[in-house]
Amino acid sequence: MSLLTEVETYVLSIVPSGPLKAEIAQRLEDVFAGKNTDLEALMEWLKTRPILSPLTKGILGFVFTLTVPSERGLQRRRFVQNALNGNGDPNNMDRAVKLYRKLKREITFHGAKDVALSYSTGALASCMGLIYNRMGTVTTEVAFGLVCATCEQIADSQHRSHRQMMTTTNPLIRHENRMVLASTTAKAMEQMAGSSEQAAEAMEVASQARQMVQAMRTIGTHPSSSAGLKDDLLENLQAYQKRMGVQIQRFK
């Protein structure tokens, strides 16, 4: 796996699924391939994206700045600086300085990542802030190691909370989660449908599912009534894909 592929993988792991994730993936690919060289326009686009947390925007801004060649005097962006200040906690800043000194001695991506993984997310963000604000310099490889360590920590905590939700025994949360998943699957079906004859069928199935979820939410239903809703939808989606000659397993 190349270095940039690894960076893209880690960064995308902290972006919530949806159309915006696909857009960000495309931007990252373009930046890494040297196709997008307008850093200012890129940062303006990033700043106005909805849904993303300030820290995720800060990390993406840091990656774009590291990768896109720019004039020396180009202004640093406030939204990135604010996201990478470790919540203004002086402890984070102290640890960030210690980490920075260690990173200065590293020359490889994996070496930097291993060193960084033993620090808290706040300290890692502050350390990125130091480098972003030109208070310290490290090689691009080392900076990417720092980015990936930060993303790994964030993804770990997201995974823990996701797993807690998936394994909860609270029937109301499980019911709502099934309905949300059914809704997003229906949305994906509509986006994939295109304009063929079979597409009308897929659209119809998706539309019925969304109406059903809406009705369940409006009138209130027994928490077990949503069981199988997403699975039925996925079955329909896979049957539709087979007829279209497409095989996509990723929805599971």
Swiss-Prot record:
Single Gene Ontology MF annotation: RNA binding
Domain of life: Viruses
Region (Membrane-binding) residue spans: 1-164
Region (RNP-binding): 165-252
Primary localization class, coarse: virion
Keywords per UniProt: Host nucleus, Membrane, RNA-binding, Viral matrix protein, Virion
Physiological role: Plays critical roles in virus replication, from virus entry and uncoating to assembly and budding of the virus particle. M1 binding to ribonucleocapsids (RNPs) in nucleus seems to inhibit viral transcription. Interaction of viral NEP with M1-RNP is thought to promote nuclear export of the complex, which is targeted to the virion assembly site at the apical plasma membrane in polarized epithelial cells. Interactions with NA and HA may bring M1, a non-raft-associated protein, into lipid rafts. Forms a continuous shell on the inner side of the lipid bilayer in virion, where it binds the RNP. Determines the virion's shape: spherical or filamentous. Clinical isolates of influenza are characterized by the presence of significant proportion of filamentous virions, whereas after multiple passage on eggs or cell culture, virions have only spherical morphology. Filamentous virions are thought to be important to infect neighboring cells, and spherical virions more suited to spread through aerosol between hosts organisms.
Listed HAMAP family: INFV_M1 (MF_04068)
Protein name: Matrix protein 1
Protein species of origin: Influenza A virus (strain A/Shearwater/Australia/1972 H6N5)
Lineage: Viruses, Riboviria, Orthornavirae, Negarnaviricota, Polyploviricotina
Gene name in the database record: M
